Amino acid sequence: MRTKLKLLAPALLLALTACNSTKPEPTANLGSGQTQMVKQFKSQKTQTFKINYLLFLPQDYDAKSEKRWPLILFLHGAGERGTNIWKVATHGPPKNVQEHPDFPFIVVSPQCPDGEHWSNEILLALLEQTVRDYTVDTNRIYLTGLSMGGFGTWDLGLTYPEKFAAIVPICGGGQMITVVLSSREKTQTLKTLGVWAFHGAKDPVVPLEESQRMVDGLKKVGVKDVKFTIYPDAGHNSWTEAYNDPQLYEWLLKHERK
């Protein structure tokens, strides 16, 4: 698919050009702007639980500078679980930054262990640690994920909407919308959250109705900033087109936590 890039600034344009589908080779930890760093996070609450993750720092990142950077927390799908951390860079932002060091976000991409699902507690602890260790713009923290990560995005984003400026769940769903519909306090917090959901109309794995139900529920409780893109010819893989769309990242950067 050829995307329209003329609306982007030059650096962002280069960063968001559609990537090819080859898997990245394991790369040494060369530092910011050159590759993603392989890191390990150990929860202080559960010392026995360790999670590996990829960390990308933009090319111009300088820890001594006063500039603070927007951050994307990316949740992969079930197929990328395990111990090979580079599987995480198969899709989405960690794939794009592997080839484009001028991507203008800090990107944190944890790997879920085999047989496990995303844990809100662990993800929040990892996010909080990253904010402590790096110069993050805490008003511009974004959450996105695909398939299993799409479910994780809905769950984490709707459970803790005050943590994020915007969320982008792709071919996901979940049960958190039931909690939202029954909680006035949660509804009020959600009204400041940007939401852009994506799904393929022909998805045989996660039915389109899963995303539709979430979007309809948000609109029902008065959440205004909700977008829903349905790709009419896409199956389960609606993420490639979504993550290769430069307008997605422009949309994210327009959102700040209020």
Regions found by a protein language model. Give the residues of each.
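Primarily recognizes the serine-hydrolase "nucleophile elbow" in alpha/beta-hydrolase
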Residues: 139-188
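Gly/Ser-rich "nucleophile elbow"/oxyanion-hole loop immediately N-terminal to the catalytic nucleophile
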Residues: 60-67, 115-148, 161
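Active-site machinery of serine-nucleophile hydrolases
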Residues: 71, 75-121
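C-terminal catalytic histidine-bearing segment of alpha/beta-hydrolase fold enzymes
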Residues: 198, 204-258
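Bacterial N-terminal signal peptides that target proteins for export
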Residues: 1-8
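Short, proline-enriched alpha-helix->beta-strand connector loops that line the catalytic pocket
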Residues: 189-195
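A domain-start/cap signature at the N-terminus of enzymes
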Residues: 19-71, 156, 181, 212-216, ...
